Curated annotation (Swiss-Prot):
Residues 1-56 are annotated as: Head. PANTHER family: INTERMEDIATE FILAMENT, KERATIN, TYPE I CUTICULAR HA4. Residues 204-219 are annotated as: Linker 12. SUPFAM superfamilies: Intermediate filament protein, coiled coil region. There are two types of hair/microfibrillar keratin, I (acidic) and II (neutral to basic). One of its GO terms (molecular function) is structural molecule activity. This is Keratin, type I cuticular Ha4.
Length: 392
């Protein structure tokens, strides 16, 4: 930035310097800072009425120096700002963007595995139910077998007792038959002895003695034996019938008792089986609930671990972003402070430029617009440029 753009009020004076009344020595020297203002303007006689004093020259020199340093500082800050922007862009390009890892595929795999685990658990529970049903059926068949076995043992015991009774009756019958045979043999012996005695007596007495004896009529032993046999057979038949009736009644009562006890036993066994089924069903349900609770606890633990890991990753990401945001804020704050400093410097420089401009405008107002005409009117010369020369 040059002084000509900052100080447009100097155009009148710079145009006047091109006139021939101004000595050549007045055009060579300029102020520091390339303001194109003649430094020896106070040496000309035509400038004697509106010349600057020493303080104004020092002020203009100071303002030119400040303006030059300000422009240099502005250029330096622009260069530093460009360097910082390049460094920020390089750093952003070098840093890899923080991308959250994709867990969707793992989540799908985990969900598929959880579905498979649930299917396997349901299949396991179904197999456990089938095994328990098979155990219940085997228990039912075992109880039925034990019931039939106990009934068979009872029937075999009854048959054995009846066989013992039959053996006793057979022995009794054989004893009675033996007694009948012994009585028959005894009767035959008695008949034979009686006939022998009668024959001996007849032989002793002969025909000499004929004794008539009023005796009881002879008894038919065969008839008596037959009657006795009939009586014993009737007695045996009666005893057999009574024993058979007693056995039948006892068997019926025993069968009734066995049937009633078997019915009671079957009802009790049915109740026991039903209670066992209920208990097994409740145990199966309890086991299923335990398995479900364990699976839910495992799922909850896995979910907590997964979400805690995700939360830690997100927290790390947030921490990194916050740190970067803090750095960016610090950079922005620093740049804002520098900008505020620059704004303050600019405001001060603008204030100084305005002061400088007001001073120049006041000096321009004090200077005549055509100094050559003024000197012609007064009839004076231009001082050191030559006393015999006129200014126009």
């Amino acid at each position: 930035m040059s002084c000509e753009s900052c100080l447009p009020a100097l155009s009148c004076r710079t145009s006047c310097s091109s006139r021939p009344c101004v000595p050549p020595s007045c055009h060579g020297c300029t102020l520091p800072g390339a303001c194109n203002i003649p430094a020896n303007v106070g040496n000309c006689n035509w400038f004697c009425e509106g010349s600057f004093n020493g303080n104004e020259k020092e002020t203009m020199q100071f303002l030119n120096d400040r303006l030059a340093s300000y422009m240099e500082k502005v250029r330096q800050l622009e260069r530093e700002n460009a360097e910082l922007e390049c460094r920020i862009q390089e750093r952003n390009q070098q840093q890899d963007p923080l991308v959250c890892p994709a867990y969707q595929a793992y989540f799908r795999t985990i969900e598929e595995l959880q579905q498979k685990i649930l299917c396997a658990k349901s299949e396991n529970a179904r197999l456990v139910v089938q095994i328990d049903n098979a155990k219940l059926a085997s228990d039912d068949f075992r109880t039925k077998y034990q019931t039939e076995l106990s009934m068979r043992q009872l029937v075999e015991a009854d048959i054995n007792s009846l066989r013992r009774i039959l053996d006793e009756l057979t022995l009794c019958k054989s004893d009675l038959e033996a007694q009948v045979e012994s009585l028959r043999e005894e009767l035959l012996c008695l008949k034979k002895n009686h006939e022998e005695e009668v024959n001996t007596l007849r032989c002793q007495l002969g025909d000499r003695l004929n004794v008539e004896v009023d005796a009881a009529p002879t008894v038919d032993l065969n008839r008596v034996l037959n009657e006795t046999r009939c009586q014993y057979e009737a007695l045996v038949e009666t005893n057999r019938r009574e024993v058979e009736e007693w056995f039948t009644t006892q068997s019926e009562e025993l069968n009734k008792q066995v049937v009633s006890s078997s019915e009671q036993l079957q009802s009790c066994q049915a109740e026991i089986i039903e209670l066992r089924r209920t208990v097994n069903a409740l145990e199966i349900e309890l086991q299923a609930q335990h398995c479900m609770r364990n699976s839910l606890e495992n799922t909850l633990t896995e979910s907590e671990a997964r979400y805690s890991s995700q939360l830690s990753q997100v927290q790390c990401l947030i921490t990194n972003v916050e740190s970067q945001l803090g750095e960016i804020r610090a950079d922005l704050e620093r740049q804002n402070q520098e900008y505020q400093v620059l704004l303050d410097v600019r405001a001060r420089l603008e204030c100084e430029i305005n002061t400088y401009r007001s001073l120049l405008e006041s000096e321009d107002c004090n200077l005549p617009c055509n100094p050559c005409a003024t000197t012609n009117a007064s009839g004076s010369c231009c001082g050191p440029c030559g006393s015999s020369k006129r200014c126009c």
